[in-house]
Amino acid sequence: MQSLQHKASEWSGVLTSNAFAIDDTNLFEKLGLQTFISLSTNFYNRVYDDEEEWFHLIFANSDKQIAIQNQYEFLVQRMGGPPLYSQRRGHPALIARHRAFPVTHEAAERWLHHMQQAVDTSSDIDDDSKIKLMNFFRHTAYFIVAGIELKNQNFQMPCKNAPSPCKN
């Protein structure tokens, strides 16, 4: 079985080494807290204004302000800043936290479309950091897709001598 990282690289087109180039520089120190707050706000404004009903509905039961806070706190922590997300919410556990949502290839691409626009319109992010961030986002989006697909496959696997699928 392929690792989730390998599958994420295959589907995203981003090598793991490029996805984790974000670790070569402390992007939190370089860009600052406000940049991540602005990026997350810009991103979620785009998501909540999305004209595609199927995509917009994914977020229908989520509070926009909480989504913004969750994202910027995660990004601050992942990009080298203080562990804001973990202090408030515990381990990020990206796959588990996204399991309730229909995170498909199509949804990942739509999510990435909005993130690319948010990154591109941020004057506070230099070009090199934009590339690193988008490589990370693209790889991570498909890491989540792969993880959810794997969990769904395992959930449906029949148990030996059982009349119905096991619940793993």
UniProtKB/Swiss-Prot annotation:
**Keywords assigned by UniProt, alphabetized:** Heme, Iron, Metal-binding, Nodulation, Oxygen transport, Transport
What is known about the tissue distribution of this protein? Mainly expressed in root nodules, but barely in leaves, roots, stems, flowers and fruits.
User: What Pfam families does the record point to?
Assistant: Bac_globin (PF01152)
What is known about its induction?
Answer: Induced by ethylene and polyamines (PA) but repressed by gibberellic acid (GA) in roots. Repressed by cytokinins (CK, an equimolar mixture of kinetin and 6-benzyl-aminopurine) in nodules. Down-regulated under cold stress in seedlings roots.
Q: Which GO terms describe its molecular function?
A: heme binding; metal ion binding; oxygen binding; oxygen carrier activity
**CDD domains, per database record:** TrHb2_AtGlb3-like_O
**Protein family according to the UniProt entry:** Belongs to the truncated hemoglobin family. Group II subfamily.
Per its database record, what is this protein's job?
Answer: Hemoglobin-like protein that exhibits an unusual concentration-independent binding of O(2) and CO. Required for general plant development and during nodulation. May promote shoot organogenesis from root explants.
UniProt-recorded name of the protein: Group 2 truncated hemoglobin 3-1
Per the UniProt record, the source organism is Lotus japonicus (Lotus corniculatus var. japonicus)
**Taxon lineage:** Eukaryota, Viridiplantae, Streptophyta, Embryophyta, Tracheophyta
